[in-house]
Amino acid sequence: MNDFDPTTLSSPAAIGHNLRRRPLVRKKLSEMVEEELEQMIRRREFGEGEQLPSERELMAFFNVGRPSVREALAALKRKGLVQINNGERARISRPSADTIIGELSGMAKDFLSHPGGIAHFEQLRLFFESSLVRYAAEHATDAQIALLEQTLALNSQSLDDNALFIRSDVDFHRVLAGIPGNPIFMAIHVALLDWLLAARPAVADADLYEHNNTSYQQHIEIFNAIRRHDPDQADRALQTHLNSVFASWHTLSAQSSSDE
């Protein structure tokens, strides 16, 4: 057996043998400007709050036209790396959790429209909120429990007003998401509910009170378990609630489809 010769792996003949024909991806000038500016920002050549050079200076520096500079700055803004106000030079900013989630929003909404998309997001919400209620039952302060109780009061006062009830319903779950004090949790939760609510079917007026009251009673069960600092019961109550909500949504969606 011949000895291993590593030089043969990098020889032109070996490389040519392993190559497969594929087109080179040509980058737009704006993408090249964007990448270079992003690297400069991440290397902290510009500090947070500092202004970038003017568009004209960037055009001269990169030897590109104004459209390329503006497209690059717009892309950096979407990433949360710069803020752009009319009449001012772009200013360096720090990406927030909201910015990161916002970048995913379009893809998430597109995914929801595909078969099985809603079910996958429902499972994500169930796993996520299950951890939240367990944490809340173990760690919620008296002030946080009082805030959760306030959202229940709004729940009870809006059973006949669907728009108001949805708002108080979201507030209840949002307070839960805020208990750990992690801004990423909050951003994920806000986005997740926004995506799911956008796909939520309408409830008939005749069924509105019963539908909302069911959710309200289930919220009470979750709250009572958290107040007793019982994570297992809080988790069971949350699972019952969300599974009930999901089943209701699927029933309403099926009815809506059959009516079309």
Curated annotation (Swiss-Prot):
Residues 27-95 form the HTH gntR-type domain. The keyword DNA-binding applies. GO terms for molecular function: DNA binding; DNA-binding transcription factor activity. Pfam families: FCD (PF07729), GntR (PF00392). Residues 55-74 bind DNA. GO terms for biological process: negative regulation of DNA-templated transcription. The keyword Plastid does not apply. Keywords: DNA-binding, Repressor, Transcription, Transcription regulation. It comes from the Bacteria. InterPro entries: GntR_C, TF_FadR/GntR_C, Tscrpt_reg_HTH_GntR, Tscrpt_reg_NanR, WH-like_DNA-bd_sf, WH_DNA-bd_sf. NCBIfam families: PRK03837.1. Transcriptional repressor that controls expression of the genes required for the catabolism of sialic acids. Belongs to the NanR family. This is HTH-type transcriptional repressor NanR.
